[in-house]
Amino acid sequence: MGGRYERAITIETAMRNISERRYLLPSIQRKFTWDIDQICRLFDSVMQHYPVNSLMLWKVDSAEIREGFQFYEFLTKYVDRFGENNPAFDTKGHGEFSAVIDGQQRLTSLYIGLKGSYAVKKPRIWWPKANDPSILPPRKLYLNLAAPLDPEHNDDQLIYDFQFLTEADVDRRTTDEKNLWFEVGRILMFPAVESDDEIVDHVLDYLGSVGQASNPFARKTLSRLYFAIRREEVLNYFVEESQDIGRVLDIFIRTNEGGTPLRPSDLLMSIMSASWEDARDRVDELVNFIRTELGFTIDRDLVMKAAVMLTNADIKP
């Protein structure tokens, strides 16, 4: 059994599928690796009508796979070092779902930008032993509706000023001709309407409430955000229907060769997870224990290399 391409969907539909656990992550997937700049560039690309690479989903029908393999939810609140692991999800008794084989980084980035937060450490402060919001404050994605980015100081050809900001950051930036920060996730709370005129009406209502109804860039940008997230079917995807875990693993390895390179530890974890259902959880638990209880900063790579060495297998530094 092979697969097929399905009709493209909106970003809003994909976000709903993630929230309702219709999209899950298989244990062969690696961690979320994108940084804040990559997420902002993705949103700018969507706003500029740039194509988003196709997704690949695995429709999981086999009861044996549903019950014998671990699946995970998407990250909502990412915290550097302390909130990087996806929550495990029990699929027993769960309805239909698909596992994301290719496109995890993009979907997670969109989900965090629209429904979650991203926490990184403040500069010039020591790393805490546990998650401390005063040191790693949650940041939400905002879009500056007041003005575009300055092309003379913008090597990436970005147009839209997306930034992850804390509540304190937003409070410090008063609304003026250069600052009108809109929380991107709020676009999902706008009324669902069909006609273009109705969309513009709601955009003007919002801008009028913040004293920016006469700003043409703000009107065009907020309208563009609505269309990009809620109206345009920009996410193309392929559905793999095979229930052969070996075939799915091979597809995962091949499709990920073109994106962020798979590290040897990523590949080894994927292979292990295909036959040891909670390998990922056990390794992550050990990493967290060594970090929090013993005070050493290590990552999954070191643990995986140590495991290979202890089995007397060939290992490269």
Segments from the language model and where they lie:
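Basic- and aromatic-enriched surface patches that contact anionic nucleotides/nucleic acids
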Residues: G2-T33, Q38-D314
